[in-house]
Swiss-Prot record:
Catalytic reactions on record: RNA(n) + a ribonucleoside 5'-triphosphate = RNA(n+1) + diphosphate
Region (Alpha C-terminal domain (alpha-CTD)): 251-339
InterPro entries in UniProt: DNA-dir_RNA_pol_insert, DNA-dir_RNA_pol_RpoA/D/Rpb3, DNA-dir_RpoA, RBP11-like, RNAP_asu_C, RNApol_insert_sf
Domain of life: Bacteria
Organism: Rhodopseudomonas palustris (strain BisB18)
Subunit structure, as described in the record: Homodimer. The RNAP catalytic core consists of 2 alpha, 1 beta, 1 beta' and 1 omega subunit. When a sigma factor is associated with the core the holoenzyme is formed, which can initiate transcription.
A Gene Ontology BP annotation from the UniProt entry: DNA-templated transcription
Protein name as annotated: DNA-directed RNA polymerase subunit alpha
Catalytic EC class: transferase
SUPFAM superfamilies with a match to the protein in the record: C-terminal domain of RNA polymerase alpha subunit, Insert subdomain of RNA polymerase alpha subunit, RBP11-like subunits of RNA polymerase
Amino acid sequence: MTIQKNWQELIRPNKLVVTPGSDPTRFATLVAEPLERGFGQTLGNALRRVLLSSLQGAAVQSVHIDGVLHEFSSIAGVREDVTDIVLNIKDISIKMQGEGPKRMVVKKQGPGTVTAGDIQTVGDVVVLNPDLQICTLDEGAEIRMEFTVAGGKGYVAAERNRPEDAPIGLIPVDSLFSPVRKVSYKVENTREGQILDYDKLTMTIETNGAISPDDAVAYAARILQDQLNVFVNFEEPRKEVTQEIIPDLAFNPAFLKKVDELELSVRSANCLKNDNIVYIGDLVQKSEAEMLRTPNFGRKSLNEIKEVLAQMGLHLGMEVPGWPPENIDELAKRFEDHY
């Protein structure tokens, strides 16, 4: 037995379906199927943990408010205490290009509300939730705040954001660097051919807009790939690459696909098998009337088959010249990557 069979003979997802949410930059659902039984939980849990803990992002590390010495202060004419202001600052979502730290400033006079959109940023820093309310100013009140923004990953508590030489009045802030806000997943059974207990992994992801959900999953998968490489203690045998000559066919290569690879109900699949219909090329030449004469084959099965064929651009009652070819089994193997 060759070592490659350990991974080459496992079923792998043949597609990753991404369904955008109401805001495609922030919300999406991703579906991967089919997976070997148990792999849905394995991959879903691993990806979720990496998504929430290991992706790089940007966040406010500290703030300096003019006239304020510490976070337990209050500011004349400002309705919120400094503690509440700092809690609001934690929720500012930021996208930053390049390396930090960077500076942002907000200066405003009352009356009115100070929002994240009032912050003056440099060109490579973008505030992603400008409607976020930071504080409320009364008539005649004024506030000026200077923020330090840096890059990082995961969650960093305020105590770790305080530099050793921090000046008086510098208030460290809890930093949530991860651009991913929420991740959930579920695993369901799915069907591949006649096997009904493969896994289907569905992941629902919300980001802060600094990265799209599908890119976030791609980066998380790349992190896992990189971390797992150290466990591979062998070199794979090199495969001789030969240029395969693909013969010209007088018919659609899809006709060489076996009908048991279609996602048909057990009843429909058994009817085709009992009627010795092996390949799609056998099936499409049948008329609707011929199919309905098949024992135990009813209108429901007919509609199911017509729908599956339509998805492939095919239909019943087709003429297939040169069918069946003499070397049909050999051709089916050679063309299995072409339909």
